Amino acid sequence: MNYFPVGKLDLKLLERLIALNPIKDPRVIVGPRIGEDAAVIDFGEKYLVAKTDPVTFTTYRIGWYAVNVNANDIAAMGATPKWFLATLLLPEKRTNKKLVTQIFNDIIKSTQALNITLCGGHTEISGKIDRPIVVGHMLGEVEKNKLVVNTNACPGDDVLLTKGIAIEGTAIIAREKTSALRKEFGEKFVKRAQAFINNPGLSVVKDALLANKAARINAMHDPTEGGLATGIFELTKASETGAIIEMKKIQIYKETRQICKLFNIDPLGLIASGALLIALDPKDTKKVINILARNGITCTKIGKLTKESEGLRLLRKGEFIKMPMFKVDEITSLIT
């Protein structure tokens, strides 16, 4: 039997599975769809935006990760994250009061920081897992005229990127491969890389809501597993477009470059929470970049959307090459 590798399901298989469940409820505005970050349901005056996402690559501050990665997906639809539910699956013979209290504290502090209400969930100790898993469920709301869906992106749109890539991957590797990194680069380097979850930070809620307030945004996408390259693929898949991306415009932090070089992994395919992709009319690009900058968020134009027939191209060292694709995230070669 051929078993699937760690990571996301094969997209062609996922498309076939999604097609088995046609949406008949007219109140479902956005259902399951590759390239969209959340579902959208009509709730009268506003839309309810709903998302679920687990945290599996790390156990460090797992409650904090669960809140932030789900909030990011809600915000990428232009919505404000409001209500959070969590399913905690805890390993038998490894779970104690200290572990559970730490996870709960992380969830509570993280929701409070984003003005989100923890409103429910489920806890369970299982003999079938060997580490804690948190599955987050986030709900948000948005004015109907401010909803952002990626199907609205079109050829000619500018593509912007907030902050830099592989922020989450850098932080996780620094936490999981501390000894090797300390030996190679020293203690200060390790601490800086581990602190990436706070600075530059994994949250893009502020990035997304500021951009959506400043201009008419055609698409926003929160690249996560599979890195920036997969995020761009998902955005263009949803919008039926192609893209030209300039490698030299993509911000890659020094720590990220050094970690990727040491472990021979590609930062374009490394889990990328903390960055936000934005597609918009070029006339609004400067306005959005300036507003984000005034709020302490770096934002760079990294390319343009093109016709779908032109595919995904990366301009690297003056040459166009095909955008690399990653069936599994680069981090899986180091952490399983």
Give the positions of each predicted feature.
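Helix-biased detector of long, well-ordered alpha-helical tracts
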Residues: 1-336
